[in-house]
Amino acid sequence: MEGAAKNLQTEVPENDFDKYLAETKANWNRQLGKIEIKGDNENDKVNFYTALYHSMIAPTIYSDVDGAYYGPDKKVHQANGWVNYSTFSLWDTYRAAHPLFTYTEPERVNDMVKSFIAFYEQNGRLPVWNFYGSETDMMIGYHAVPVIVDAYLKGIGDFDAKKALDACIATANLDNYRGIGLYKELGYIPYNVTDHYNAENWSLSKTLEYAFDDYCIAEMAKKMGKQDIADEFYKRSQNYKNVYNPATSFMQPRDDKGIF
């Protein structure tokens, strides 16, 4: 309650609705004005700026104005000099939204990566679908990885790159999590083997998503001069080839015997 009271006092110190309405409009105009489009078609402009607005609804600030936030370990932590973010539906957003943020919100991208690292320190792995500080484990892949790597390769922020890479590697090596151990052993995830974290059996999709994320880890490691790690993950990234069925020209699931 004390944190909420501080937030209210800091963000809305006066009882003046019209003032804050005007400030909110100005803030949104400033945000949406980061990209200017040209053309005479008003419908196209409405569609574009509506979509841009939607892209800015999440991730969301999760820390109080004094930096306090509730971590995945159920403890209160402090973000000193940065803002903690949550609401990361990374399977949905790593392809387009997060690359967009590197152009429209680079300072926030830095804080998002720091939020990932903090989550790893408190939970032992990077977030998959983080919502208000907790992990939902919805969707697949470890797609905090491409977000981190994109920021690193673009030279964004002052986050700890070594710690970020460590977090990526640790997450990619959780053998008991959603078929990762089988992915490493067989070069793909078999559809007929399930466990606590692999019960939904998205074996083909997981294999493809993991291979992409592994390629990203390899690229970051290479840039950091860690060629042994880069070689390991470049090799893993080729696992996508193991689910290509030349007989049908489709990517297809395989069982633990290798049969499509």
Stretch-by-stretch model annotation:
Residues 136-209, 218:
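Active-site lining segments of carbohydrate-active enzymes
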